[in-house]
C-alpha cells in the first residue's frame, strides 16, 4: 500500500466544512500525515466581459483573496489548531483545476472532500467539483456527504 504522508482537504467557506473534520482528523491521525487545507477563490476576471473597469475587478479580486486569507487564519485558530502538521493555501481560479494543480505541486497522497449532494438541474448546470476530482486525480479521493440531522 502506498504511504499516505500528505492529505489535501479543499474547503468552501460557504459550507459547513467543520462537519467533515472528525473524518479528516481520523485519516490524518491514522497516517500521521500533514494536512493541507485549500480554499479556491473564484477568478473574477472571467466577469470582465461585463462593463466593469479592469482595475475595479482586479482590486475586488485582491480584496477577496485578502479576505480569504484572513478567513483561513481564523479557521486555523478556531477549527484546525488540533492538527499538528498543517499547511494552508489560498488559490484563485477554477476549483477543480486548482485542486488538481495543488495535488501535483505538493505531492498530495490522498484527497478528502465534502460533497454538496446537488441533484437534478442544479447539478447539471453547476457540475460537481468532487466528480471532476474523482475522475482526474492521480491519487485516491475520499468523499464525505454531510450528515443529515
Predicted regions and their residues:
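Short beta->alpha linker loops
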Residues: 67, 90-94, 116
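General small-molecule cofactor/ligand-binding pocket signal
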Residues: 36-38, 87-91, 142
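Gly/Ser-rich helix-loop-strand patches that form or flank binding pockets
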Residues: 3, 102-149
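A short acidic, glycine-rich active-site loop
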Residues: 55-70
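Structural beta-alpha unit
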Residues: 2, 30, 77-111, 149
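Small/aliphatic-rich secondary-structure junction motif
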Residues: 2-54
Amino acid at each position: 500500500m502506498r504511504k499516505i504522508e500528505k492529505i489535501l482537504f479543499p474547503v468552501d467557506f460557504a459550507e459547513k466544512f467543520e462537519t467533515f473534520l472528525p473524518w479528516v482528523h481520523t485519516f490524518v491521525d491514522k497516517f500521521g500525515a500533514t494536512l493541507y487545507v485549500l480554499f479556491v477563490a473564484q477568478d473574477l476576471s472571467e466577469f470582465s466581459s461585463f462593463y466593469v473597469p479592469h482595475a475595479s475587478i482586479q482590486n475586488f479580486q485582491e480584496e477577496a483573496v485578502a479576505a480569504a486569507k484572513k478567513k483561513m487564519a481564523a479557521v486555523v485558530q478556531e477549527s484546525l489548531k488540533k492538527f499538528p502538521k498543517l499547511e494552508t493555501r489560498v488559490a484563485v481560479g477554477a476549483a477543480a483545476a486548482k485542486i488538481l494543480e495543488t495535488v501535483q505541486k505538493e505531492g498530495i497522497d490522498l484527497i478528502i472532500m465534502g460533497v454538496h449532494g446537488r441533484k437534478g438541474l442544479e447539478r447539471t448546470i453547476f457540475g460537481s467539483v468532487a466528480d471532476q476530482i474523482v475522475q482526474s486525480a492521480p491519487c485516491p479521493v475520499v468523499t464525505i456527504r454531510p450528515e443529515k440531522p
